[in-house]
Amino acid sequence: MKTITTDCLVIGAGLAGSAYALQAARQGLQVELLSLEGPLVANSDWAQGGIIYDRSPAPEQLAHDIVEASDGTANPAAVEHLVREGPAAVQELLLDELDVAFDRDARGELELAREGGHSSRRIIHAKDLTGHAILQSVAARVDGTPAITRRSGWVAVDLLTLSHNSDDVADRYAPLTCFGAYVLDTATGEVHAVVAKKTVLASGGLGQIFLHSTNQPGSVGHGMAMSYRVGARLIDLEYVQFHPTVFFKKNAPRFLITEALRGEGAVLVNSRGERFMDAIHPRGSLAPRDIVARAIHLELAASGEPCVFLNLSAMKPDFIRERFPTVAARCAEHGVDVTREWIPVVPAAHFSCGGVHTDLAGRTNVRHLNAIGETACTGLHGANRLASTSLLECLTSAKFTALADGADIKAGGFRLPQPRLWQAAAREADPTLIRQDLQLLRSTMWNYAGIMRSPKRLTRARRILLELREEIQSFYRDCRVTRELIELRNAVQTALLVVHAASLNPVSKGCHYVVDGE
């Protein structure tokens, strides 16, 4: 086992992890940045709509929209922090330093879009590939920064804590403290130890524990599961947001249909052309996501139809092709001309409003363990997230966590012990069993812990998942670790955490909707 020592270990190289790495490097810190895949394989890369850049004289209106979308449950301190600090975070990194190619009008001013739940236009964008444009620029800057070492194909296995993984016997009595992680190099199959003064979880969300998801493969709540195993507090995990509009066609892949379409005039209709959202919410098709997703679910249950539709007829064809080229091209690949035809859509798991509980500087209850981005939960989103807040949250949480970590490290007082050697098993896990277990897990979560839940459904889900966890733990104890086995182990733990949180909360709020009966 090789041991690598650094100032900061960042697990996840999406926007939050990469922005943290850049901010930490500017303070003279050495950073190890781990990612499952290459630099652009992250949920941030798939964000289509945009990022909030609110320079209005009335920022309190944005705060109002965030709280309203959350059904009145958002943490006021977290909301105020994002509204106050968000514009500077965007200006400093994305506009001044990286000059990201956001869309501009004929005068050179940033174009502003509107999405569901927003009372005004305040979202900047790069066509319908905003996340890709941002992450591409950020990743290039990361790769040009000597203080940052990118480790693609390195997967965190478990966090290191003094009481469990130090080779110093006296550390078993130490306060709960993280000092890095065991990490699998998937290219060699070897497990190494990365020892760090600060460990930052930026591993994204958990959407792939559900059968239908907008998330990248591997988004199974890695950071949430690992932090739970070392005693970190998790909160609000019952609040899983389902995006209302994901492309649906038999034998075609599911992909996100950006909410910005509805901001520009697209409306949801059923197979008869009826605008069913108009009778449900004053904003109609621009209602908050939880309301729209649930309305679609109920519409489909009542009609027996497989999908609803987005009607884009309010937009001119040239505007659609110019503003939404990615959506137009991907739909065309599957036989839908969005300038003339309705887009068939269904909801899918999209974003975890809950996560590892942190303060506004990313600190968890485990010393020297931080969490940022979607992995973390400050209470910003409460029971439901407002559209286009996710990328902004990534930037602000990364910035302030890195600044706090820089100050802590400069103050000194860190002791990094030698970790215990990793004990590798020899037997290979059966890949067929792993695939089947993951499929069962995802189907269970979709059917029993999805958009609408009941106590009996959740009880059934918990029973199935507990049996699965026993089998998976046996794999993990007896077999050599692989990426697939790590993902399965973390997926079942995260799924159980979501089901447990949902079972404890009988109150329907936002994304968590409880019904009586089977």
Annotate the PLM regions.
Residues 3-6, 189-198, 365-368:
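Core beta-strand elements of the Rossmann-like FAD/NAD(P) dinucleotide-binding domain
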Residues 4, 23, 27, 38-40, ...:
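Glycine- and aromatic-enriched mobile tails/lids
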Residues 8-33:
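N-terminal Rossmann-like FAD-binding beta1-loop-alpha1 element of flavoenzymes
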Residues 37-67, 71, 241-244, 252-255:
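Conserved N-terminal glycine-rich FAD pyrophosphate-binding loop of Rossmann-like flavoproteins
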Residues 76-87, 122-140, 151, 213-221, ...:
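Short beta-strand to alpha-helix junction loop
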Residues 94-190, 195, 202, 246-249, ...:
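Conserved redox-cofactor binding core of oxidoreductases
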Residues 198-255, 302, 388-400:
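Glycine-rich loop(s) and the adjacent beta-strand/alpha-helix scaffold that form part
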Residues 226, 232-341, 404-410:
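An anion/pyrophosphate-binding glycine-rich loop and adjacent beta-alpha core
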